[in-house]
């Protein structure tokens, strides 16, 4: 806890609730502010938008329905409360007549009844829901205290305070202020030097300079990205039972850079929702679309893929609705929304925008599931650019030799008919070549344990075959049992099959040629696999012609690599022993292209080909390749080899790049149906993409696809997006949004504490180029933000949640910042922007409890000390320390920040190796940087954590604690050694161990202070 004494006050939230309601405003009653919340909470469940649950056909969510003649009476008769059935029912004495009915458990208190009665008396004026009315910039309100406001925000806040007979608090001291804004904008506390520089800067713009420096820091993007990752449900695993690892961190890098570069929020929106559909879309714009691939993906066997295709599209749509619209339209999946004007048809029309993605219902258990793309880092892209320049030079050198090549090739071919016999075959990537074999159906040829291939390897199998029976194995690698793990190129009923199997049918690929091949005839077959883990990545050629394929099984999720030997003519069980002959069986460690497959299918020698007056394209290619590789002069051979080597190096480089799952439209639009009760297998009415009917229409003149939806999101006519986003920005700095229910701007959501301020900020944001940094700078530059957070008892009693903003924000730090601050204070923090996720300290054995028993292998070295933003996030076992401090679980979209206080948090700070190690490294800083005396060193450590010097009694407490701990560790040097061994970082052996341990214990005390883990 804070070393300063705070009296614990039991507070009642009722006074503030009263302030928010009609009693805080002069008459007349306002429908949106005062009446709609009552009707929504107590009446809409039976008399709202959902016809399925509506009683006696009475609607109270519609003005027309509310005023309609119900057979000689009306629910509401404007101006006449006594004639209104609504008022009669809510005041009825008889339980059988009273509304809400007693059995519902819903009640109206006396004040709410009087509000409804007063509203009817005043004419029952109806309003469209406030959030559905486009925001207009309100005039700045007049205020009495004209000296206090520093920008327009303050005018709105002060006007409300003055109406309540309240005054704002004084400005926080500079040490508090710089710590507050540093934690808010960067997630890292200021250094003592930064604090002192700010305190001693007499310039009138000293604070603004601090704000500008933090806004331009690379730390800013990391701080802002943390909350966006919560909203986007980012994780490093797929979720569900298997919860295998995926690779999405390049999207996280994109988010960080977008914030750091101050990408306008409209572009930020469009690129994430539809960057792939932008004309000439760039790699980065496609990476941005990973926002909508961050949802969970089920790789379990036995699932119904169609069911999960629906779940994924629903997740995308509902996440989009929460993040940009502050909408609970997800409640309309099975029926019309019970509170808001969203129909089930609205739901599925929005759903349709996300139902045309070329993904699959069953995700790969490990790795990324298509569609995905290479996503090189800037450093990797620089390597690729350099490689492309080298390749371009090599291509030019080769092309410059073209005339000489053609002349030399012609001379060589003309001489071949009279030359000694010569032949050539594709050799690049060749693993093995097996000569001619004859099989009688009783045995196979064991080729031994040649190179093994797995599902992330490309490979090819080539062979001349002369089959005598329609079924038989050509080349296999696996146990001599049908459908066991491994590779199998076989014939079955005359058709060629390639099988890649870990476990049949659960983890396997099987493709088959549509047509059978003839028996008792020599023919050449090639089967290739491209490492995609998809059946579409397989090709089969017969005599150089690509064969039409039928996909029989496309469910490969795990690696089929096996140590079993390669077998020629068998290996799939006795029923697949080959009968006939084979020759020139070749195995390649890469995917052969169509041209290479064609050349391998030419059995004639080079001499024979050269003797022909006319040659096929494949025959001409075989002559040309043979010449360039083996018979041209040295300069030509070198140019040819250099070009091919660089092409191969480029392929390997691209294959080494990280990938990211992205959005990609299907070429043919998938039909979308309204699903009865939300069930995937109960399609109803066919629907087309559209936005909810209650909202403005999508602009005409462009395809009605995700790009149209994305642009509609940031269209000035959209009443929600700008409000929703600035409200979440406000939550970042004040802990609570102007609308507390940041995820719900509907009827069940909260009325804004400052509606005019919300609208002013929304309009300012959208009309100033959607400038994220500018709107956030305005917030932190305001006098409202800069107030002290200390609250007198009367203010605490009147406004316990600080919704009226008569004081500055004070709240526990976010989970990431608690840890990052400890790393920064201790000097352990490794600041590297972007990159793969890391695995810092975590209690042993947590992952083993999960299905599959995978163990958590923590990192070593610098990776242990990266910012928490980069911590590996396993959905079924999130980082436990982060969860203790209320981090979002990342299973679904979370936009409201949660804060609790539990004993587990204190236990975490006192015992987790992260904080023990930080304490001892902080102690080293205290001894090496803090001065010569214990008092100076302890004051330095205190300032590292709190940005201020300890006060009199605080210094005494720190010194007493240090002396006590020093006595203990001088007596028990083993305990000192044990403490100083916590964590991987080395301890400074030059420092006295007992003294260092004593300082480390006090450092732990400081890191546990309420003031340390609180922004105030």
Segments and roles (model prediction):
Residues 144-180, 184-219, 233-279, 341, ...:
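Primarily short, surface-exposed interaction patches in extracytoplasmic proteins
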Residues 984-1016:
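Short, amphipathic C-terminal "tail helix"
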Residues 113, 396, 400-656, 822:
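Extracellular glycan-associated modules
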Residues 2-3, 7-30, 117-142, 226, ...:
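Post-cleavage N-terminal segment of exported redox proteins
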Residues 240, 261, 289-433, 572-573, ...:
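Active-site histidine-acidic residue metal-binding/catalytic motifs
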Residues 25-159, 163, 175-180, 190-196, ...:
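Solvent-exposed helix-loop boundary motif
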Residues 52-53, 77-82, 92, 123-126, ...:
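Extracellular/periplasmic catalytic domains that process cell-envelope and extracellular macromolecules
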């Amino acid at each position: 806890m804070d070393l300063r004494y705070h009296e614990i006050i039991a507070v009642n939230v009722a006074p503030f609730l009263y302030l928010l309601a009609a009693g805080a405003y002069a008459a007349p009653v306002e429908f949106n502010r005062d009446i709609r919340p009552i009707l929504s909470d107590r009446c809409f469940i039976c008399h709202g938008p959902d016809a399925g649950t509506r009683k006696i056909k009475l609607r109270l969510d519609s003005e027309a329905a509310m005023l309609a003649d119900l057979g000689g009476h009306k629910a509401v008769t404007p101006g006449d409360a006594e004639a209104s059935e609504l008022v009669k029912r809510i005041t009825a004495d008889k339980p059988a007549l009273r509304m809400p009915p007693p059995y519902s458990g819903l009640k109206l208190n006396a004040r709410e009844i009087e509000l409804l009665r007063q509203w009817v008396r005043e004419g029952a004026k109806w309003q469209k829901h406030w959030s559905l009315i486009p925001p207009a910039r309100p005039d700045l309100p007049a205020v009495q205290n004209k000296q206090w406001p520093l920008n327009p925000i303050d005018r709105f806040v002060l006007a409300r305070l003055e109406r309540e007979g309240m005054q704002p608090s004084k400005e926080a001291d500079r040490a508090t202020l710089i710590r507050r804004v540093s934690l808010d904008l960067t997630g890292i506390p200021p250094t003592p030097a930064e604090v002192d520089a700010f305190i001693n800067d007499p310039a009138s713009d000293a604070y603004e300079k601090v704000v500008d420096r933090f806004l331009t820091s690379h730390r800013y993007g990391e701080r802002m990205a943390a909350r966006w990752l919560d909203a986007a449900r980012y994780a490093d695993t797929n979720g569900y039972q298997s919860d295998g690892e995926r690779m999405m961190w390049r999207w996280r890098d994109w988010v960080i850079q977008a914030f750091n570069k101050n990408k306008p929020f409209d572009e930020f929106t469009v690129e994430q929702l539809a960057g792939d559909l932008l004309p000439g879309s760039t790699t980065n714009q496609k990476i941005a679309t990973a926002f909508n691939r961050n949802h969970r993906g089920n790789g379990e066997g036995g699932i119904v893929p169609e069911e999960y295709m629906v779940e994924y599209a629903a997740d995308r749509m509902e996440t989009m609705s929460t993040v940009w619209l502050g909408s609970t339209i997800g409640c309309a999946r099975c029926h019309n929304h019970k509170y808001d004007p969203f129909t089930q048809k609205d739901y599925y029309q929005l759903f349709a925008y996300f139902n045309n993605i070329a993904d699959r219902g069953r995700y790969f258990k490990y790795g990324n599931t298509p569609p995905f793309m290479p996503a090189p880092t800037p450093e990797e892209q620089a390597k690729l650019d350099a490689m492309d320049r080298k390749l371009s030079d090599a291509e030019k050198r080769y092309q410059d030799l073209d005339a000489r090549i053609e002349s030399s090739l012609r001379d060589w071919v003309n001489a071949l008919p009279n030359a000694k016999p010569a032949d050539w075959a594709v050799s690049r990537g060749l693993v093995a070549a097996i000569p001619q074999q004859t099989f009688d159906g009783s045995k196979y040829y064991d080729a031994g344990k040649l190179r093994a291939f797995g599902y992330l390897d490309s490979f090819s199998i080539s062979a001349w075959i002369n089959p005598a029976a329609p079924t038989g194995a050509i080349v296999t690698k696996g146990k001599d049992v049908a459908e066991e793990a491994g590779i199998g190129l076989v014939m079955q009923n005359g058709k060629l099959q390639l099988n890649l199997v870990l476990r049949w049918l659960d983890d396997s690929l099987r493709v088959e040629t549509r047509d059978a091949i003839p028996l008792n005839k020599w023919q050449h077959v090639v089967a290739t696999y491209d490492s995609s883990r998809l059946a579409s990545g397989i090709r089969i050629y017969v005599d150089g012609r690509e064969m039409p394929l039928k996909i029989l099984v496309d469910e490969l999720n795990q690696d089929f690599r096996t140590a079993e030997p390669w077998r020629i003519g068998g290996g799939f069980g006795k029923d697949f022993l080959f009968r006939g002959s084979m020759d020139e069986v070749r195995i390649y460690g890469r995917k052969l292209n169509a041209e290479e497959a064609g050349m391998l299918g030419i059995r004639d020698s080079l001499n024979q080909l050269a003797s022909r007056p006319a040659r096929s394209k494949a025959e001409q290619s075989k002559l040309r390749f043979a010449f360039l590789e083996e018979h041209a002069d040295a300069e030509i051979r070198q140019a040819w080899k250099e070009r091919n080597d660089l092409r191969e190096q480029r392929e390997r480089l691209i294959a080494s790049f990280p990938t990211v799952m992205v959005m990609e439209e299907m070429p043919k639009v998938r039909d979308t149906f309204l699903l009865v009760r939300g069930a995937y297998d109960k399609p109803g009415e066919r629907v087309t993409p559209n936005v909810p009917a209650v909202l403005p229409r999508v602009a005409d003149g462009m395809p009605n696809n995700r790009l149209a939806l994305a642009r509609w999101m940031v269209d000035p006519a959209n009443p929600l997006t700008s409000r929703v986003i600035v409200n979440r920005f406000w939550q970042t700095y004040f802990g609570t949004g102007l609308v507390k229910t940041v995820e719900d701007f509907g009827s069940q959501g909260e009325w804004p504490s400052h509606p005019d301020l919300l609208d002013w900020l929304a309009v300012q944001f959208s009309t100033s180029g959607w400038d994220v940094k500018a709107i956030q700078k305005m917030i932190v530059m305001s006098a409202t933000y800069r107030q002290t957070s200390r609250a007198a008892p009367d203010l605490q009693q009147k406004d316990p949640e600080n919704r009226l903003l008569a004081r500055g924000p004070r709240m526990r730090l976010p989970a990431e910042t608690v840890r990052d601050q400890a790393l920064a204070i201790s000097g352990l923090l490794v600041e590297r922007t972007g990159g793969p996720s890391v695995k810092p300290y975590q209690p042993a054995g947590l992952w083993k409890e999960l299905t599959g028993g995978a163990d958590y292998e923590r990192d070593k070295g610098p990776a242990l000390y990266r910012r928490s933003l980069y911590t590996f996030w396993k959905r079924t076992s999130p980082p436990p320390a982060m969860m203790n401090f209320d981090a979002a679980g990342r299973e679904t979209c979370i936009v409201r920040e949660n804060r609790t206080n539990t004993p587990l948090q204190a236990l975490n700070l006192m015992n987790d190796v992260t904080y023990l190690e930080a304490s001892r490294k902080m102690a080293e800083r205290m001894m090496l940087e803090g001065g010569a005396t214990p008092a100076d060193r302890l004051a330095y450590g205190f300032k590292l954590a709190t940005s201020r010097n300890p006060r009199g009694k605080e210094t005494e407490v720190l010194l007493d604690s240090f002396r006590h701990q020093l006595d203990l560790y001088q007596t028990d040097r083993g305990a000192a050694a044990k403490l100083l061994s916590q964590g991987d970082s080395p301890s400074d052996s030059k420092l006295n161990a007992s003294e260092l341990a004593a300082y480390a214990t006090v450092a732990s005390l400081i890191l546990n202070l309420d003031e340390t883990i609180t922004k105030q």
